[in-house]
Amino acid sequence: MSIITLITDFGNKDHFVAKIKGDIYSNYDKAKVVDISNEVSPFNVMEAAYILENAYKSFPENSVHIIDVDSEKTIEKKHIVMCLDNHFFISADNGILSILSQNINPEKIFEITIQEELDR
């Protein structure tokens, strides 16, 4: 069973976290989605990085960690996938994953380009 974790600055009052989970389950109903935190202070990448760094190692290898903090996709702000310590991290390219990988070299880093393909 795949484990997917979420760290967001969305809070829990609105539909945003439920929409992410619904999208995940609609595409992969066997996934197990775990909220690490949805209460990160808005746009606070340092807080998100701190939470992530202290939580991800508690999950099994090959877990997928989605960090949706300060993540509006624009031409200037790309999204990336990083393989680190046998875990997968998905985030905006806003410094969160750079903070996480200060002491461990990532195995791979990819830019997510799926939106460019969908826009064609």
Give each language-model segment a name.
Residues 27, 39, 43-48, 54, ...:
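Active-site histidine-anchored catalytic micro-motif
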Residues 17:
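Glycine-rich phosphate/diphosphate-binding loop of Rossmann-like nucleotide-binding domains
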Residues 1-5:
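Extreme N-terminal starter segment of soluble prokaryotic enzymes
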Residues 23-31:
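Short helix-loop-beta junction
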Residues 32-40:
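A short beta-strand-loop structural module common to alpha/beta enzyme folds
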